[in-house]
Amino acid sequence: PAVNYKELRGDNNKAESSAQIRERVIRAREVQLNRFAAAKERIYSNAQMGTGHIRTYCELGSDSERMLERAMQQQGLSARAHDRILKVARTIADLEGNPQVESKHIAEAIQYRTLDRTYWA
């Protein structure tokens, strides 16, 4: 998401500390472990999800579906890119403590994908 310049240059007391970020990551990892505990396969994180798991755990609302579809068409993304975007969006939602993958998570994941293709391809 876009960063407000004044917030960036202003008082940094609002910024998360490394310890807070660490706790958020630990909570997200616990959510993922619990999510996949009943899976037949040994899956420990969103990155390991296959297509079936993605369909189960990355349900999208109509706005999110449209956003992802538009990105796929405009950027000429593959099925593999589609799945990667959904895995990243699911992880972003987990880090936020949100059980639903929302449009903002899809948008952020698409931005990461675009950066990856632009600067590290």
Task: Specify the residue positions occupied by each region the protein language model found.
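Basic, amphipathic alpha-helical bundle interface domains used for macromolecular binding and assembly
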Residues: P1-W120
